[in-house]
Curated annotation (Swiss-Prot):
GO terms for biological process: rRNA processing. This is Endoribonuclease YbeY. Its EC number is 3.1.-.-. Binds 1 zinc ion. The gene is ybeY. Zn(2+) binds at H115, H119, H125. Pfam families: YbeY. NCBIfam families: rRNA maturation RNase YbeY (TIGR00043). InterPro entries: MetalPrtase_cat_dom_sf_prd, YbeY, YbeY_CS. It is found in: Cytoplasm. It comes from Bifidobacterium longum (strain NCC 2705).
Length: 182
């Protein structure tokens, strides 16, 4: 199984934690070890462009998933293999959401990684029942991963003096983004 992690931001992020999380979640969901996944961390401008292009929604968002081979969780007897797809995460939006939720940016980005993987596997949260199922599963997966990997909750940080890219985006494009309108 291959989980490639790319960080195109100034955030200091340990790619191994996210690679390990991806491999572990795919194993828990019975996806073949021959499957591939890419996780990218980007600034507000690139994710805002993707958000507009693919969702026709303005502004940066926290996470977007781009499925490739439409793999689904395995039944325990057979496992699906192929290219699962790409997950794109904006640490700036994650940091804002984490502050609002009262937990660390790293916890938020790990949660968003699981959220993105579940979307790639066909989960959604359009209806209340789907939301209950998906959010319950992502919480269970995250808490279990933390229980197994105590070192997974290291902090994601920014080098001193790094300008706030989300504030710069808002200044250039107008503030007033609604984080709850995903």
């Amino acid at each position: 199984m291959s989980v490639d992690v790319t960080n195109e931001t100034q955030w200091v992020i340990d790619p191994k934690v996210f690679s390990d999380l991806g491999i572990w979640v795919l194993d828990q969901m019975r996806v073949s070890t021959q499957s591939d996944l890419t996780i990218m961390f980007v600034d507000p401008d690139p994710i805002a462009e993707l958000h507009m292009r693919w969702m026709n929604l303005e502004g940066p968002t926290d996470v977007m998933s781009f499925p490739m081979d439409e793999l689904r969780p395995g039944d325990g007897k057979t496992v699906m293999e192929g290219v699962l797809g790409d997950i794109v995460i904006c640490p700036w939006v994650a940091a804002q959401q984490a502050a609002a939720a009262g937990h660390s940016t790293m916890q938020e980005m790990l949660l968003l990684t699981i959220h993105g993987i579940l979307h790639l596997l066909g989960y959604d949260h359009v209806t209340p029942e789907q939301e209950r199922q998906m959010f319950g599963l992502q919480r269970q997966l995250l808490l279990t991963f933390f229980a197994l990997r105590h070192d997974a909750n290291v902090q994601a940080t920014l080098p001193a003096g790094t300008p706030d890219a989300l504030a710069l985006y808002d200044a250039a494009h107008g503030a007033g983004r609604d984080l709850d309108s995903k």
